[in-house]
């Protein structure tokens, strides 16, 4: 009798992406936004098989896209046996319910997807509590469309963390859990605040930037330690702090979660304690991926997030990373314009901005000595101001 073998591998979920091109958005921007959403889906562990877009003044109140476009999506999802549809925006509870009723597959919005990735990345008790709190706050207004009890975990993307709840009877359970998590995080915050006070005398430098720009690689290079660095969105979730010494001047360098366009407000709120490393830093090192076609949009996103957490007025060193991957043909102001070279951008940026900036490649070790010298000079200014009698160090 022949022995039968069964494939026990978990089937990779297949996803369709949906985006709306609103007034003021270009086709190129919409394409870039969906590419980022595809990267998010890949980071979560699924495969994107098709994208749908529609030009609208604003998303449809009932179904996000128009009824005709929704029919197109439904036909494709049914014919290709798609597992889930992901929308590049936050859906209202009613939109989510209406779309689910129409498509009869798993529906995720951008916020749910990002929260799910955070749930998969969280390692420490603090990060896990922060993510769970954000997920429950996202879940609470959406209780009426959920079908699984809170304690019954359902697998797959969008289902990690606290799971899903059945109906209003679970509202009290979720509210109690939210209260418990807030108390737990307050206790962790007090411990973290004590730790920060203990190291307050040292100059503190925080790496900030859009997700996947190379912050952790720079952290490893400067601190000569191994911090997890990967070509995935949100590879770093928990804050890492290392002591660094350049030319006899010591300082603390922290690497924390990367920012992203449309970062869920639940996450910004719940991660405020983690972002205290940024808020309380003396100097911010803003890392930019200059090889990215829309790096200037990413700069704007980071600046808006810094403003939201109360850190916009900090001293900033801008580090344009990945110069080895810069391609002039991807950077032009208008369709017919000449491509912008790296030299052109350096000249224009330096002319417009007074804050210090430098262009490097962390992976290829290009211009690293100048980068270290720039950090040294900026840290020395703060250090000298704090310790005026330490001048013999220099």
Q: How does the language model describe each region?
A:
Residues 112-131:
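Short alpha-helix plus adjacent loop in nuclease-associated cores
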Residues 22-26, 56-63, 90-93, 261, ...:
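Conserved Switch II/interswitch segment of TRAFAC-class P-loop GTPases
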Residues 111-115, 233-234, 363:
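Short, acidic/turn-prone active-site loops that include or flank metal/cofactor-
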Residues 1-3, 189-190, 196-200, 221-252, ...:
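Switch I (effector-binding) loop of TRAFAC-class P-loop GTPase G-domains
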Residues 9-10, 77-79, 100, 243-247, ...:
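Conserved catalytic network of the ASCE P-loop NTPase/AAA+ motor domain
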Residues 1-110, 114:
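N-terminal accessory targeting/assembly segments
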Residues 1-17, 38, 137, 141-213, ...:
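C-terminal-of-GTPase-core extension/linker across diverse P-loop GTPases
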Residues 2-7, 30-35, 58-75, 238-239, ...:
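Switch II of P-loop NTPase G domains
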């Amino acid at each position: 009798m022949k022995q039968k073998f069964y494939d026990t591998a978990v089937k990779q979920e297949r996803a369709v992406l949906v985006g709306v091109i609103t007034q003021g958005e270009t086709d190129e921007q919409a394409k870039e936004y969906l590419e980022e959403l595809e990267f998010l889906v890949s980071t979560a562990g699924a495969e994107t098989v098709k994208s749908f877009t529609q030009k609208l003044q604003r998303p449809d109140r009932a179904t996000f896209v128009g009824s005709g476009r929704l029919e197109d999506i439904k036909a494709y999802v049914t014919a290709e046996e798609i597992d889930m549809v992901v929308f590049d925006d936050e859906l209202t509870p009613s939109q989510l319910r209406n779309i689910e009723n129409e498509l009869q597959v798993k529906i995720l919005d951008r916020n749910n997807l990002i929260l799910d990735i955070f749930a998969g990345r969280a390692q420490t008790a603090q990060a896990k509590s922060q993510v769970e709190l954000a997920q429950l706050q996202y879940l609470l207004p959406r209780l009426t469309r959920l079908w699984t009890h809170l304690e019954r975990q359902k697998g797959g993307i969008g289902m990690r963390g606290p799971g899903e709840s059945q109906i209003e009877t679970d509202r009290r359970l979720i509210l109690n859990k939210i209260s418990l998590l807030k108390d737990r995080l307050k206790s962790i915050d007090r411990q973290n605040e004590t730790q920060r006070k203990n190291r307050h005398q040292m100059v503190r430098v925080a790496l900030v930037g859009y997700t996947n720009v190379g912050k952790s690689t720079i952290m490893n290079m400067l601190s000569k330690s191994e911090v997890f660095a990967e070509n995935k969105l949100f590879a770093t979730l928990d804050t890492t702090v290392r002591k660094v010494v350049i030319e006899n001047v010591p300082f603390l360098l922290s690497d924390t979660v990367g920012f992203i366009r449309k970062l869920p407000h639940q996450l910004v709120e719940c991660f405020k304690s983690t972002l205290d490393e940024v808020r309380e830093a003396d100097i911010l090192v803003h890392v930019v991926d200059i090889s990215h076609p829309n790096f200037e949009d990413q700069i704007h996103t980071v600046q808006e997030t810094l403003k939201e957490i109360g850190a916009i007025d900090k001293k900033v060193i801008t580090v344009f990373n990945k110069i080895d991957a810069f391609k002039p043909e991807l950077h032009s102001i208008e369709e017919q314009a000449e491509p912008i070279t790296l030299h052109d951008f350096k000249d224009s940026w330096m002319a417009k901005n007074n804050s210090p900036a430098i262009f490097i490649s962390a992976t290829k070790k290009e211009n690293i000595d100048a980068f270290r010298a720039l950090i040294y000079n900026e840290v020395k200014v703060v250090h000298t101001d704090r310790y005026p009698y330490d001048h013999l160090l220099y």
